[in-house]
Amino acid sequence: MSSEARSRSSVARSAHSLRLRPWHVRVLAVSVAVLLCTTGLPAYSVLTHEEIVDLVWTDQIGPLLLKRFPTLTEDQLKEAHAYAYGGAVIQDLGYYPFGSVEFSNLVHYVRSGDFVRELLAQSQDADEYAFALGALAHYASDISGHPAVNTAVALQYPKLRARYGNSVKYAEDHTAHLKTEFGFDMVQVAKNRYASQQYHDFIGFQVSKTLLERTFPIVYGIELKEILTHEDLAIGSYRFAVSRTIPEMTRVALRTHQKDMMKETPDFAKEKFLYRLKRSDYEKEWGKDYKKDGFKTRVFSILLRYMPKIGPFKALAFNNPTAQTEDLYFKSINTTVDQYRIYLKQVSASSLELVNTDFDTGKPAKAAEYSLADNTYAKLLSQLADHKFSLTSPKLRDNILGFYSDLSLPLQTKKDSAQWQSVLASLDQLKSTTPNASVEPAPSQPTPN
């Protein structure tokens, strides 16, 4: 009997022992379908983004909400917490089923700070405000998280380090990034360092569609529906993936890898993180264990033992972090929380300033420094030209012209001569076009509760 036949036989016996029924197969099929359509999750994974919100919820985010909306009830605060979770990973919406990678590329590489500031300015109620504050958490997370992951990938993969140096960016090896990020999540779950899945289920996960629709054309000069052509389906599948499929796959991976998880080692950065975690009071009420294995988890873990780690399953073949890379992770989390607290204080004082950062490098977005940024600017410019720059605001015009201020730079776009000629023609059109000042309205006023 071949090894492939033996694998199929083992899976069949294991599934039979668990009495796999038709409805179980359907549930598993839906989960696998979502996973198959997920194209990538750069920077911190979902659980880490949500944890950043949890670490500052009680002493900063909650009070900020009450400062602006003083009559909020406990139930309304809980609902706002769900929207903060949604905002904390909204920049990654395009990487989920039925989403648009173009959406995530724009908010990662083009006017990333302006996008978050405009979400805050346009928010009208507590849910929208919480959603915007969550998006600010993502901004803080990515500008410190990406450089840390870039370094960790280089440490975990010597061949990549030899090729790219001590920092391996997402565009240079997607798979290594996914494995590294997922490995960080697995270790934290294994050691009970995240708010429990029971707590996440209680809070929920929400997306402020109307706020996104108002904000996106102001920042990028095109309507959201042009980028997310199946907007409702994209948001719905995104919520399902974050609240159901990803936690399920986390439990599956944990079940299959837990014996190999690294042992604890003394470390100052880790202790600082754990101290902050203990100050959160979620553990008292909800327990610290990630949700226990259920039927689906047991079946999935059996199937995945024999499934080749290719395509969307590559991340499940992650390497456990080393003591050195886990230290990088903790330091980046601590830096993120410290910086996020500063941003929240600036929000409270109406003095928030955010640099338009390239999330993958953690540096200000500039031409010829990152291939994905170059390509994203070129595509946006082409789309704006197709619309005769009708929704192009003065700030957007200045941002694009600033990006292309030195045409002698070795931009990635120049590798395609036709695309580069299109960029040059569109730039000439933009320079001769009067921007639409009405696109940038005065910030919306809070809606009283």
Predicted features, each with a name:
Residues 26-38:
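Bacterial N-terminal signal peptides
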Residues 27, 247-255:
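Short, low-complexity Pro/Thr/Gly
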Residues 41-130, 143-225, 255-260, 271-449:
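N-terminal, motif-rich segments that launch catalysis or mediate targeting to/interaction with membranes
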Residues 137, 250, 265-266:
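Mature extracellular/secreted ectodomains of secretory-pathway proteins
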Residues 225-233:
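Ordered core of a single globular domain
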Residues 235-245:
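Eukaryote-specific, cytoplasm-facing alpha-helical/coiled-coil scaffolding segments in long proteins
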